[in-house]
């Protein structure tokens, strides 16, 4: 059985309970999401989660990691500039001072630099998509869907106004 633990962040205002206490007890860290699979160690880093998903996927399902090593290197590189330290999502987090921003290294200087870094990643991905389109592909890497496409489609929601039909407002 695989499951992802994604508790609410922060402290419950009514009870004073740390909402991530159980996550820390299980994993010795508080990053989200965290994946659990059977009795194996928890996975909380995107690259480990992707490897686990590939490992436990059914044999006849498409893979998200290319078999071709050059394409694999491209795919992991693009994923890293979106998901990794000092990448798009990282810099989105440190644009504002707050608990999440401070967890990822917020400072006045980092906050000022962050929008430029986000713009660089978006420009890189735009250029890549244009190059791929010229070769007849609508994907970031090669001619099939990869993890880079999935991660970019998901994380691009943090830089666009997402319509409520795609992401309904929550309480």
Model-predicted regions and their roles:
Residues 77, 81-170:
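GST-like fold's C-terminal all-alpha helical module
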Residues 1-4, 167-171:
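Short, intrinsically disordered, charge-balanced linker/junction segments flanking boundaries
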Residues 1-109:
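GST-like domain detector, emphasizing the conserved glutathione-binding G-site
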């Amino acid at each position: 059985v695989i499951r992802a633990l994604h508790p609410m962040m922060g402290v419950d205002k009514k009870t004073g309970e740390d909402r991530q206490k159980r996550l820390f007890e299980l994993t010795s860290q508080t990053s989200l999401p965290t994946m659990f699979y059977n009795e194996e160690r928890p996975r909380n880093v995107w690259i480990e989660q992707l490897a686990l998903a590939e490992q436990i996927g059914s044999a006849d399902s498409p893979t998200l990691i290319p078999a071709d090593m050059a394409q694999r290197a491209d795919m992991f590189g693009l994923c890293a500039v979106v998901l990794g330290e000092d990448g798009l999502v990282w810099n989105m987090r440190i644009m504002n001072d707050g608990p999440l921003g401070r967890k990822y290294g917020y400072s006045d200087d980092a906050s000022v630099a962050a929008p430029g870094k986000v713009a660089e990643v978006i420009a890189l991905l735009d250029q890549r998509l244009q190059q791929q389109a010229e070769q007849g592909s609508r994907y970031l890497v090669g001619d099939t869907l990869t993890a880079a496409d999935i991660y970019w489609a998901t994380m691009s929601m943090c830089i666009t106004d997402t319509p409520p039909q795609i992401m309904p407002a929550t309480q």
